[in-house]
Every structure is written in structure tokens, then in C-alpha cells.
Amino acid sequence: MQDQPVIATSDLSAHVGSTVVLRGWLYNKRSSGKLHFLELRDGFGTVQCVMAKSDVGDEVFAAADKVTQESVIDVVGEVKAHPKRAGVYEIAASGFRVLGPTAGEYPISPKEHGTDFLMDHRHLWLRSKRQHAILRVRHTIIQAIRDFFDGRGFTLVDAPVFTPNACEGTSTLFQTDYHGEKAYLTQSGQLYMEAAAAAFGKAYCFGPTFRAEKSKTRRHLAEFWMVEPEVAFMDLAGDMDLAEDFLCFIVERVLERRRPELAVLERDVGKLEAVKKPFPRIRYDEAVAILNEARAEKRKMAGEAEIPDFPWGEDFGGEDETIISGRYDRPVMIHRYPAQVKAFYMKRDPTDDRLALCVDVLAPEGYGEVIGGGQREDDLATLERAIEAHQLPPEAFGWYLDLRRYGTFPHAGFGLGVERSVAWICGLPHVRETIPFPRMLNRLSP
């Protein structure tokens, strides 16, 4: 066995007709008389190894009969192309050995398990074909994010995880002790990217962010990853163009490189292929009109006169976003929300001071907001008034106001949540499967 090369399952096509060694974990096993069918996975994929008793002898055949799920094994055999399925290969096994047996029955058996059980065993659940496919797609999305910004002249600038102040209240921040001072885990690197944009013109940060929200929805995690670009001399229109190009690039990359994984997930790739420019761009007022049309129809169908119209000036909830995005086959951009529901640093619309020059991008199929951004306020006096109006501590923003004191400039940017994007592209019902070890309201382990 030592005389044969150890190869990965991803390289089988180059070794058809050759005898090789495969090394990995026993994913599944079934037997039929004098044949064993061993499914081996090695981290790159899986392959079926067909073992005939006549080819390996009684001792090896008996050892294969006893091997348990997820034992580490070597299988030696000839690589053969599947007679009916193009691109699929099998191993005609001629040798076998166990390198690392399991300590008893593997906890995740082929039977159905509940979500809580699987999350308790997340460290093992990652080995399943479905989870493997999801995290492969996640990897490709992250790679595409970096390639997109690298290809457009952006500089990666790391934002701090510890922040010294609670800029927008402490209700959704994780507080910790920092050498005797109060510190908070970051919710966003955006303010720091504004400083970086003044230094580099085009900058982005990419890292974990933390929200202490008491939310148990399918869209919320306490810890998630976000990429936040910021560009000098860019306005809201340019910001929307950048976001549109960005999402198209990511989806195209996944379709190009991860179709086998999408097939494992039974994802309707036709819905992803529809993600093409231009995206519909509607104002907040138009989105409210869509909601009110839906509510009017609901009143008519259900005969419930007490269903009110959507109140202008409120932010959209998850159900609202689902209704709005349901009108379109691709992401929809909603811009110019009421300033009262957006952050203090958003620039006001010069034609209507009630509105912010902001944009949210809603993914189709009810996946909700995946991008939020806008143009930042670049006037010092206006920003000072906004900080005061939001009852924020002005001393905490001295460095941020310096960006307006010393060479102020128009700029814009956005943030994209990786996990929501993975959920949308993979077609998942919940974000908990989009990150290797999710942190949620009632889950801190494993």
C-alpha cells in the first residue's frame, strides 16, 4: 500500500485506470453478500469504494465489515469512471486498513436528528455533505469578496474589535472590561473606514461584528462577518452602482465554481442566474406603496378592515422586506429612507431634509437585507448637530469630527453581511448553518 500514491478525491479524473491510495473518513457503508460499498470522504469530496471479497480475502473483508462510521481508513484500488454518470468515479478496492478507529458509535447516525441535537454536535455535523457544501460556498463568497475589492484598487484596512464607546446606545452592544475601562465589541468598522478612505481613497474592512440583540429570528446571529467598503468622492448613486456590481460578481463566482455544491443543496440555480444588472431601484415611498397595496389586498381577501396601512416613517421589518422583495426576481435597492430610522452620520437629501441619502439592498426570495449603506455627512456643523440630536456623547466623536475639520470630502460606503448572503445564495431557511460555529441568543457552544 505504501508504494502507491495517496491522492485526493478531487484528483480522481487524472488517475483513471491507475491504482492509488485514498485516505480519509468512512462516511457511509453498506453491504450486499460478498460486496462492501464504502463511501470515503477526504475533505475534498466523497467516492464509493467497491470491495469484493474475492479481491481482498477473508481477513480484509471481515475488517471492512467491522469498521465504524467516521473511522479513518486507507483504501487502495483502481480508479474507474462510472459507466453511466459523467464525472463520477469509483474505486475497485484491492486493499484496506484502519488507521484511526472510532471510540464507539458515531453520534450522528444516518437517521433524522433534531436541530438542537445537531447544533450540540456542530463540531461533528460539519462533516456532513450538506454542511460541507454550505461552507464551501461560504469560502468562495469570501474569496470573491477579496478578489472584487483587490481588483478595483481597494486597500484592506483592519478595524478594531474593541471600541471605547457606545456610539448608538448600549442595548445591542457586548460590554467587556478593558484594563479597567469599559469597552465594547464592535458592531461596525464603518467609522474607521471613513478615516481610511481619507488616507487611501478606497478602503475596506472585513471581520467579525457583534450584536447583543435579543433576537431569535432566522436572520440573526450574535456574531457574524461583515465587509465594509468606503470610497472617497463617491455619492449615493455611485454607492448603489458599486453594491450592484459587487453582488453580481459574488453570485457569478459561485455559479462558476460551486455548481456541484449547489446541487447537493438542491438550490434552484435559475433564481441565481437571474441576478443580473440592472437591479430595480425604488424610493422608500414606493416601497411603502407596495406594502399598502399588499395590506389592501389582505383586507379585501380576509375581510379584516382593522388591518392598517404601513405608517410612513417607520423602518421595515422582516415580513415587510419579504413582501417588497417578492415583487422582483433579483435584488431590489430601496433608497432615501426617512432620516429618523437611519444612523446619525447619514447625509440628508438636499431636496427633502426628511430623507437620508441611504440604500438597503434586499435579496430576493424573502432573504431580506444583505447590504446597507449610503452617503455620509461631510459637513462639520451638520454632523455636530446630528450627534447632539441623537443624544450621543460628543467627546466620544472628537477623532471622527476631525475627519471633517481637516480636509472634509464627500464619501459613501456600505456593509454586506456574509451569513445572510450565504443563506440567500445557498437557499437556506436559517442563518445558523452559514457559519461553522454559530453564536446565537441561547447558544455559546461548541
Curated annotation (Swiss-Prot):
Highest taxon listed in the record's lineage: Bacteria
A single MF term (Gene Ontology): ATP binding
Primary localisation category: cytoplasm
EC number: 6.1.1.22
A Pfam family per the record: tRNA_anti-codon
Disulphide bonds in the chain: none
Gene Ontology CC entries for this record: cytoplasm
Intracellular or extracellular location(s): Cytoplasm
UniProt similarity note: Belongs to the class-II aminoacyl-tRNA synthetase family.
Subunit structure and binding partners: Homodimer.
Annotated protein name in UniProt: Asparagine--tRNA ligase
Species of origin: Sorangium cellulosum (strain So ce56) (Polyangium cellulosum (strain So ce56))
Gene name for this UniProt entry: asnS
